[in-house]
């Protein structure tokens, strides 16, 4: 009986550990506070990658997320060169953001995305000055990363 209990506990622990690694192993280091994003960028002397997304309704946003943002190539490159912030504008009730985050994202949209383009990818310097911008391109993650780097010039 004790042996069965040990096996059950071990199986549950293994499932939990696997799910934990899958969840956090694939997660991005996306910031949720833009002021902290700017502070980190200044401290680390990095540019800011600001992404306007409609994560649950914008098909090109979802495709960009799956092809580029979730790729290992992007994760590695972002860690080296950028502090990343996603200003998300979900529509489904289940995906709604906190009122504070919604307000913050709205302020960012007023400043950087007045036309309401989705997705909109903006490269900023550490002070928040726009260096360049782009949108969805149906290209590979490495090609999109090069596109972002081209905005640095």
Q: Where do the PLM segments sit?
A:
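Thiol-based oxidoreductase modules, predominantly thioredoxin-like and allied folds used
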Residues: 30-31, 74-103
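Bacterial Sec-dependent N-terminal signal peptides
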Residues: 1-29
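A short beta-strand-turn-helix
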Residues: 31-48, 78
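Short active-site neighborhood of thiol/selenol oxidoreductases, capturing the structured segment around
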Residues: 44-58
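Non-catalytic, surface beta->alpha helical segment in thiol-disulfide oxidoreductase systems
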Residues: 110-111, 115-153
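Typically the conserved alpha-helix immediately C-terminal to a functionally engaged Cys/Sec
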Residues: 61-77
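Hydrophobic beta-strand anchors of alpha/beta hydrolase catalytic cores
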Residues: 49-50, 84, 121
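The canonical Cys-X-X-Cys-His
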Residues: 58-61, 121
């Amino acid at each position: 009986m004790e042996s069965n209990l040990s096996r059950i506990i071990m199986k549950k622990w293994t499932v939990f550990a696997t799910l934990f690694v899958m969840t956090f192993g694939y997660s991005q280091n996306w910031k949720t506070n833009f002021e902290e994003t700017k502070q980190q960028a200044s401290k680390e002397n990095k540019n800011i990658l600001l992404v306007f997304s409609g994560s649950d309704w914008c098909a090109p946003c979802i495709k960009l997320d799956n092809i580029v943002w979730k790729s290992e190539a992007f994760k590695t490159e972002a860690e080296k060169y950028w502090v990343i912030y996603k200003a998300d504008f979900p529509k489904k009730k289940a995906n709604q953001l906190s009122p504070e985050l919604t307000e913050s994202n709205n302020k960012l949209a007023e400043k950087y995305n007045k036309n309401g383009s989705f997705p909109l990818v903006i490269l900023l310097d550490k002070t928040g000055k726009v260096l360049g911008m782009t949108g969805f391109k149906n290209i590979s993650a490495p090609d999109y990363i090069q596109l972002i780097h081209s905005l640095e010039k």
